[in-house]
Amino acid sequence: MFDILPRTRLAFLPTPLHPMRNLGKELGLDNLWIKRDDMTGPGFGGNKTRKLEFVIGDAKQQGCDTLVTVGALQSNHCRQTAAAAAAAGMRCVLLLGGEEPDEYTGNLLLDAIYGAEIKFFPNEGFLPLNDRLASVVTTLEELGLKPYAVPAGAATPIGSLAYAAAIQELKQQLDRAAFSPERIIVATSTGGTLAGMIAGQHMMGLDAEILGLNVYDSADAATSRVRDLLQRMMREYPSLVEKFKPAILIDDRFIGEGYAVMGDPERKAIEMFARLEGVLLDPVYTGKAGVGLIQMAMSGEIPSDSPTLFWHTGGQPALFAYSQELHQRTAVGGSTDAKRKQTSEAGEVTDGF
């Protein structure tokens, strides 16, 4: 079905799908599973690698040799773009919103290691930087390069179609595992992943609610972005995505103290997933989605007998940029023995939720 699209194979697919029995038991959920798009590889994996297969395929088809994209200082998308560009033999230019730090850590360090050319914009957020792409592309063309502009999050129709293909992959795995989730929970910001999943849900006849937990701004703003992408997908790829009326479900209750700000709920969610399942979340996206899963389960908003799938979108390298906050939280928790005791006693690991 998706073979008609240009594609440069990068990801290690299919990504694993497996149950989270320990976390499910702690939260009172009988059937909790996880889809591991943190394991797409290369570049430490993440959801953008799927998108970049189609984005780079399109860029190469157009004869481009340079990827230009935007993001925040600890952008997972930019890190994956830098890695994918290296693997595809292309140059990479990153426009990052924020002040250049004295020390590079986390994703920013990896951007540099992958050879990306980085430009910092101290007074701009990452989404407004999309408006700078055209002028940067013009400058690079004047230098003799053939640049390809990639908006934040690779949130384009062709990038989003990667997640329609991901739903096809998931449906095959669900059939083999005899698992039928009633809901799929996924973090969202720029909206490309969620738009693709909703399109794929329609294309594949997947009978599951897809809930995007917004980590960036209001549910209304996020819904507008997702709706716009879906309309563009229907318009630009009518042979793949027929016209339909999408059900866009976005919840903005779990943003916490703001985008890329890690508070106590995010720390606790990261610790719960790590100590009960050996799964690492990130502070910016999946940490907040994890908070949403935990709070909805504990409040009864997710019924105990309702099969639920948590879609992990990656982002763990950002943990190293938050090492001080995470270390302080661990130190407050006490000794290793005390922490082991805490995670073994019923109810203790959910304190604070």
Regions found by a protein language model. Give the residues of each.
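PLP-dependent amino-acid enzyme catalytic core
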Residues: 1-353
